Amino acid sequence: MCHVIVTCRSMLWTLLSIVVAFAELIAFMSADWLIGKARSRGGVEPAGPGGGSPEPYHPTLGIYARCIRNPGVQHFQRDTLCGPYAESFGEIASGFWQATAIFLAVGIFILCMVALVSVFTMCVQSIMKKSIFNVCGLLQGIAGLFLILGLILYPAGWGCQKAIDYCGHYASAYKPGDCSLGWAFYTAIGGTVLTFICAVFSAQAEIATSSDKVQEEIEEGKNLICLL
């Protein structure tokens, strides 16, 4: 018989697992990993004060995507073009970024699978006599390792020509030059930290759903068990 077991710790682990998966996915797809040096609407560096140049903007560059100002649009606020600069995997600007894309994609795929499974842990807590929480926690730890590898390799690609075009000639491996780090990079780092927190917290979710109080509720014949 299926028993629906909901505890604070198991629900918190489920919510965190979903949040982490979405955060990493959004960061990976974003173009806001590097914020480029200021440019004018025509794509060149703006002149100094009083130079009469158009209002400057900051282009952004991601692993495979970028955001630039559309030079043909003059009177609309939404004149930024965002999309992939690479039409295929081989066109990603750096070999390091290609490796980053692979590691992040594998890690995110694992996190998404765990997030999906975590929803069903309210009804099914074990499979083949193995705790789903412990298995998911192990998978989250593995995903975290893939994410770390991707994030370590990503700055090594800052010396590629694409990054130099956005960040100036001083850009090199692990030196962003005139660029600053965007919110997507920090989101990916934060998501990686939360991934390991989820991996550790999965053990608490397992303890909460297999406690003596839960067993007492099951023995009383209850199918819906909610415990704080």
Swiss-Prot record:
It is found in: Membrane. PANTHER family: LHFPL TETRASPAN SUBFAMILY MEMBER 2 PROTEIN, LIPOMA HMGIC FUSION PARTNER-LIKE PROTEIN. Gene3D superfamilies: 1.20.140.150. Belongs to the LHFP family. This is LHFPL tetraspan subfamily member 2 protein. The keyword Cell membrane does not apply. The chain crosses the membrane at residues 11-31, 102-122, 132-152, 181-201. Plays a role in female and male fertility. Involved in distal reproductive tract development. It holds the Pfam family L_HMGIC_fpl. It is a multi-pass membrane protein. Expressed in all tissues and cell lines examined except brain and peripheral blood leukocytes. It comes from the Eukaryota. Its main location: membrane. GO terms for cellular component: membrane; plasma membrane; platelet alpha granule membrane. InterPro entries: LHFPL. It comes from Homo sapiens. One of its GO terms (biological process) is development of primary male sexual characteristics. Keywords: Fertilization, Membrane, Transmembrane, Transmembrane helix.
